[in-house]
């Protein structure tokens, strides 16, 4: 088990679904890099630095997990990090088509980079960052969907936005 894997995403914010997949990946691979994409086209609520910090807090108990922000092509980031595997999550069949296209594009751009798909635990299969932000925006309790530190950060971020 000498494989370096990257689990890429925007993580705006990191959810229990993401954390579940990170835990699973950490058991499968020697070293897991959580690649947090700058991704300005998604207009993230949290800055890249804030997202890196939140993911670091949520994954602090995992010795073989490293959190790194990046911009640019994922395949270039994977090469820089000497990773041979991309970990992707599949919540539902609806995720598969996009992930399949992405995996094929990544394979075309970097033939030695393998994509591995993991599914979250059933209780996390419906959670997305978008839904969590939507619930929080309307005053709902997101504590069952995110780590307590993420819930606090999200509440503070929304309070600032309303001020």
Swiss-Prot record:
<keyword id="KW-0547">Nucleotide-binding</keyword>
<dbReference type="InterPro" id="IPR001980">
    <property type="entry name" value="PPAT"/>
</dbReference>
<feature type="binding site">
    <location>
        <position position="99"/>
    </location>
    <ligand>
        <name>ATP</name>
    </ligand>
</feature>
<dbReference type="GO" id="GO:0005524">
    <property type="term" value="F:ATP binding"/>
</dbReference>
<feature type="binding site">
    <location>
        <begin position="89"/>
        <end position="91"/>
    </location>
    <ligand>
        <name>ATP</name>
    </ligand>
</feature>
<keyword id="KW-0460">Magnesium</keyword>
<comment type="pathway">
    <text>Cofactor biosynthesis; coenzyme A biosynthesis; CoA from (R)-pantothenate: step 4/5.</text>
</comment>
<keyword id="KW-0067">ATP-binding</keyword>
<dbReference type="InterPro" id="IPR014729">
    <property type="entry name" value="Rossmann-like_a/b/a_fold"/>
</dbReference>
<feature type="binding site">
    <location>
        <position position="88"/>
    </location>
    <ligand>
        <name>substrate</name>
    </ligand>
</feature>
<comment type="function">
    <text>Reversibly transfers an adenylyl group from ATP to 4'-phosphopantetheine, yielding dephospho-CoA (dPCoA) and pyrophosphate.</text>
</comment>
<dbReference type="GO" id="GO:0015937">
    <property type="term" value="P:coenzyme A biosynthetic process"/>
</dbReference>
<dbReference type="Pfam" id="PF01467">
    <property type="entry name" value="CTP_transf_like"/>
</dbReference>
<feature type="binding site">
    <location>
        <begin position="10"/>
        <end position="11"/>
    </location>
    <ligand>
        <name>ATP</name>
    </ligand>
</feature>
<feature type="binding site">
    <location>
        <position position="74"/>
    </location>
    <ligand>
        <name>substrate</name>
    </ligand>
</feature>
<dbReference type="GO" id="GO:0004595">
    <property type="term" value="F:pantetheine-phosphate adenylyltransferase activity"/>
</dbReference>
<dbReference type="InterPro" id="IPR004821">
    <property type="entry name" value="Cyt_trans-like"/>
</dbReference>
<keyword id="KW-0808">Transferase</keyword>
<feature type="binding site">
    <location>
        <position position="10"/>
    </location>
    <ligand>
        <name>substrate</name>
    </ligand>
</feature>
<comment type="similarity">
    <text>Belongs to the bacterial CoaD family.</text>
</comment>
<feature type="site" description="Transition state stabilizer">
    <location>
        <position position="18"/>
    </location>
</feature>
<dbReference type="GO" id="GO:0005737">
    <property type="term" value="C:cytoplasm"/>
</dbReference>
<keyword id="KW-0548">Nucleotidyltransferase</keyword>
<feature type="binding site">
    <location>
        <begin position="124"/>
        <end position="130"/>
    </location>
    <ligand>
        <name>ATP</name>
    </ligand>
</feature>
<comment type="subunit">
    <text>Homohexamer.</text>
</comment>
<keyword id="KW-0963">Cytoplasm</keyword>
<feature type="binding site">
    <location>
        <position position="42"/>
    </location>
    <ligand>
        <name>substrate</name>
    </ligand>
</feature>
<protein>
    <recommendedName>
        <fullName>Phosphopantetheine adenylyltransferase</fullName>
        <ecNumber>2.7.7.3</ecNumber>
    </recommendedName>
</protein>
<keyword id="KW-0173">Coenzyme A biosynthesis</keyword>
<feature type="binding site">
    <location>
        <position position="18"/>
    </location>
    <ligand>
        <name>ATP</name>
    </ligand>
</feature>
